[in-house]
């Protein structure tokens, strides 16, 4: 919507962000993405805190107020390319998306490389933009052997390329998030 794009642009400029992403919701209203946190669990690499949270039971997660900490716009380690804003010149200066990561983690890798180059500019998740997203609707889930193998190899490439980031708890959450 125009509101979401305008809000993302304003947030991006206000924080002088290198990358800005949006809170994404499943059609049911559950949280799909609210910024990505690094985890030290090698089989996951990154995850979204409060992913799957039932917003029907926790209305404050969807309200316009900021009563819940993850309902506030915040800095995070990465955002998903499902809704990501970045200046073209910044995108090109770091080489764009890594084509070795054909399906998964190319957005996370982009965020990590952007933050490495532009250390003083934050990656922001704008939670006042709530967008409904049909995760993996067009490409399907990674639920067969071939897709699972590709996902595994792409995760290993990400971890090997940015190994230093996976040796300590997530910088912005201060904890090593367990899986939900």
Give each language-model segment a name.
Residues 7, 19, 110-113, 153-161:
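Generic recognition of well-ordered alpha-helical segments
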Residues 3-9, 67-95, 100-130:
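A short, conserved alpha-helix in the catalytic core of glycosyltransferases
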Residues 27-29, 40-75, 80, 85, ...:
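C-terminal, non-catalytic tails of nucleotide-sugar-dependent glycosyltransferases
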Residues 2-46, 50, 120-121:
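Conserved donor NDP-sugar-binding/catalytic core segment of glycosyltransferases
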Residues 20-23, 126-127, 134:
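Short glycine/serine/threonine-enriched helix-capping/active-site loop
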Residues 1, 27-31, 104, 110, ...:
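Flexible loop/turn segments at secondary-structure boundaries
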Residues 14-15, 100, 117, 161:
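Generic structural signal for alpha-helix termini and adjacent loop/cap motifs
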Residues 2, 105, 148-152:
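Non-membrane alpha-helical structural segments and their capping/turn regions in soluble enzymes
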């Amino acid at each position: 919507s125009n509101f979401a794009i305008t809000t993302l642009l304003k947030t991006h400029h206000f924080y002088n962000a290198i990358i800005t992403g949006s809170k994404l919701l499943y059609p049911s209203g559950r949280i799909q993405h609210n910024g990505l946190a690094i985890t030290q669990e090698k089989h996951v690499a990154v995850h979204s805190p409060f992913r799957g949270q039932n917003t029907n039971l926790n209305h404050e997660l969807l309200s316009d107020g900021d009563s819940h900490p993850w309902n506030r716009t915040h800095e995070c380690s990465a955002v998903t390319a499902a809704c990501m804003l970045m200046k073209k010149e910044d995108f090109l200066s770091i080489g764009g998306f890594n084509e070795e990561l054909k399906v998964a983690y190319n957005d996370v890798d982009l965020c990590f490389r952007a933050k490495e180059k532009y250390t003083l500019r934050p990656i922001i998740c704008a939670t006042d933009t709530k967008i409904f997203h049909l995760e993996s609707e067009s490409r399907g889930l990674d639920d067969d052997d071939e897709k699972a193998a590709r996902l595994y190899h792409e995760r290993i490439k990400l971890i090997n390329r940015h190994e230093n980031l996976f040796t300590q708890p997530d910088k912005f959450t201060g904890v090593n998030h367990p899986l939900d």
